[in-house]
Amino acid sequence: MNVESQSEHLKQSKNWYQSLPAEWQNWLNENIENGCDVQKISLILQSHGLSPRVDQYLFSEDEQLSEQLQNELLDYSLEGLETVEILEKIKQKNISNHLIIQFLKHVNNNVIFKKLKQLQQQQNKQRWLLQVMGQLNQLNNHSTSTIDSIETPDFETFIERYYSQMRPVILKGGMQHWPALHKWSPEYFAQHFENELVEVQMHREQYQDFEKKSVQLKRIILMQDFVAQIKATKRSNDIYLTANNAAQNKQFMQKISEDLGDFAKGYCQKEIKDRHFLWFGPAGTFTPLHYDLTNNMLAQIYGRKKVTLIPAWQMPYMYNDHWVFSQVSDVVKADLAAYPLLENVTPFECILQPGETLFIPIGWWHSVESLDMSISVSFTHFNVNNHFFTEYPQDLIR
């Protein structure tokens, strides 16, 4: 379609044209009659939120490209493919090469798309650097398919070998002095806090994305009723008391915090009293793949948990679509045909026993499954900087 016919078609796109305010219709008619460039006209309209879809004025109705095909063409262009390579990619779709070439020409001259390509270029370089970090990590003698399990070292050694290196580790003996380890059980909570109102998540199994809907799944229940429900459940992900319930359960946590203490000597900031988070539920409770915005300790008090971890530098393969979550909830059960990038990840799996504590470094992806009825406590108040979440970028697409 030549410039003259493009101009005429721009006026003849009735639904769009008639939706313009009268002054903009007059402006459009005047500029087209004066022979102004259609693409420049479009950019001005676009800047005022008045522009139609690109292909609605480049092509007639029977020539328009589907939204799916447009997205495919944009993806190929962002990958750096030349027009000839893109045409080869889609030759089986029986679409006129002329339409494709015109569309790509318009897109590549668009100032917004140019900025998008610049950002994509930066992201590609960041991804390359993460890949290099992962490859170099494989040269480390400590880099294996298993996670170290050691007696809790002094705090300086922990910082040097694990915290600062972003290496997960299972620590033994660090909470042997906690009364919680020797007292807490479902029966203990039911007997000593039977009339305590606690907030939990319920009906999780009704939603595939239950973790993203955690706010609407919150319910208030008596502790004795909560314990009765989970004891009557052999295996379920339907009811769970988690860290997401911490704000409402603050008073309850204050009551039981006397059963907790410093981890090993010097690990925690003792003056901070509100950085313990309770996890309590039946066998089968599951927290899907995500990463945390702080370094975390997960202390197992009752029952066992299986934790699957994936290194932070493998984020480019993790289909991170929303906040800290992945489109994939469980990497072990993932459909690799649907999510082929997951073939590049190296999961680490461990089973956490009562009395053991897992250090989960910031940015490390992990999912957690309760193998038994389970009580855990996580905490973040390390005696070093762990205040990174305030600089975390907001999602631009919600």
Residue ranges, per PLM feature:
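Fe(II)/2-oxoglutarate
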Residues: 1-16, 21-22, 28, 34, ...
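N-terminal accessory scaffold of Fe(II)-dependent oxygenases
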Residues: 98-357, 365-398
